[in-house]
């Protein structure tokens, strides 16, 4: 039944996307096609607004390559982020170049008053450039249209109705969702485009990394595993949701096979809640309530293995090799991004076959 529910939700999302596209076509015809330019003058931009009104952790982190690129191309510009991921301010507020995070509501009570308060805060500032970084977001188009901005940048497509001054055509080839916003900015500013150099970006302070290392060591000590010098620590997160989830029996077989290949490995399971049930009894386990804490702990590991979920994207911001396990979504669009990361489509593989592939990456 859970898989049936997830399948139904997937079809509903697809239906919403089709309706959103058709509505965009209607609005575009009513409003009329506008003339847009494709090239921005960096010398005219001192303030930037990025609008991504989406409550998911992964979609929020997919903005970080663009933020890094913007800061490199416009080092003196202040960047404001209009986001709706609930922990966005803590997660991204201290990034180089970012001045503030304007948080729009995602769920819960009093949505309209909270939305209007965030909108007033956004409209209190006049920006040189406002960016809608994704091609099909109705909320992004709305925020872009309501912002006080001299220039408005987004993607050009038939259903686009927002009041853009500058628009870039979608790339012909499929592009990872973490690369697409950076491509938009690089193209508009006339900068070199090297997609292989991009990665998710979440700078950590040394004290955060030290605390993460201590948390991992404490979790290992709690089960009496000990951590002899040279023993690699491999973390994993198994609690994905819906069709992305792999059952505990799958993880038990996977770890039995991987430890047979690498008996020196110390496994640590990262849990979504302190009371969550572990998938493999006897392993060290760790719950860290804040995303930056979780990221810092992952940054100290030899490898991190994750079903397609938010912690996979957090892990990909670190130097730790990250293995994403996919069975419901396209890793070409959503997989971990840096060069040492790897995505494995597991739907038609046994846990033992997946362990063999992870062993090669290890």
Segments (PLM) and residue ranges:
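Catalytic machinery of carbohydrate-active enzymes
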Residues: 1-362
């Amino acid at each position: 039944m859970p898989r049936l529910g997830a399948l139904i939700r997937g079809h509903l999302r697809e239906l919403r996307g089709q309706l959103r596209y058709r509505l965009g076509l209607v609005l575009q015809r009513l409003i009329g096609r506008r003339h847009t330019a494709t090239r921005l003058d960096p010398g005219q931009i001192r303030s930037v607004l990025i609008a991504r009104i989406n409550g998911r952790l992964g979609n929020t982190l997919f903005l970080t390559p663009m933020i890094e690129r913007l800061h490199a191309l416009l080092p003196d510009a202040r960047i404001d982020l209009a986001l709706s991921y609930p922990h966005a301010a803590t997660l991204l507020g201290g990034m180089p170049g970012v001045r503030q995070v304007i948080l729009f509501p995602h769920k819960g009570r009093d949505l309209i008053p909270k939305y209007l308060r965030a909108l007033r805060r956004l409209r209190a500032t006049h920006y040189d450039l406002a960016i809608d970084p994704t091609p099909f977001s109705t909320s992004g188009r709305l925020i872009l249209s309501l912002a006080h901005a001299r220039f408005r940048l987004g993607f050009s497509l038939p259903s686009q109705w927002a009041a853009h001054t500058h628009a870039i055509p979608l790339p012909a080839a499929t592009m990872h969702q973490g690369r697409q916003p950076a491509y938009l900015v690089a193209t508009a500013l006339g900068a070199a485009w090297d997609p292989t150099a991009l990665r998710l970006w979440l700078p950590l302070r040394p004290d955060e990394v030290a605390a993460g290392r201590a948390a991992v060591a404490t979790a290992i000590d709690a089960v009496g595993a000990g951590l002899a010098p040279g023993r690699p620590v491999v973390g994993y997160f198994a609690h994905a949701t819906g069709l992305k989830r792999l059952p505990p029996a799958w993880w038990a077989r996977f770890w039995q096979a991987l430890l047979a290949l690498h008996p020196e490995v110390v496994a640590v399971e990262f849990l979504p809640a302190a009371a969550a049930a572990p998938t493999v009894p006897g392993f060290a386990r760790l719950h860290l309530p804040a995303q930056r804490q979780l990221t810092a702990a992952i940054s100290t590991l030899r490898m991190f293995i994750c079903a397609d979920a938010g912690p996979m994207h957090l892990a990909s911001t670190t130097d730790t090799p990250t293995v994403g396990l996919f069975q419901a979504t396209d890793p070409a669009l959503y997989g971990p991004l840096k060069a040492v990361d790897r995505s494995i489509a597991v739907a038609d593989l046994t846990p033992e076959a997946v362990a063999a592939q992870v062993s090669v990456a290890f």
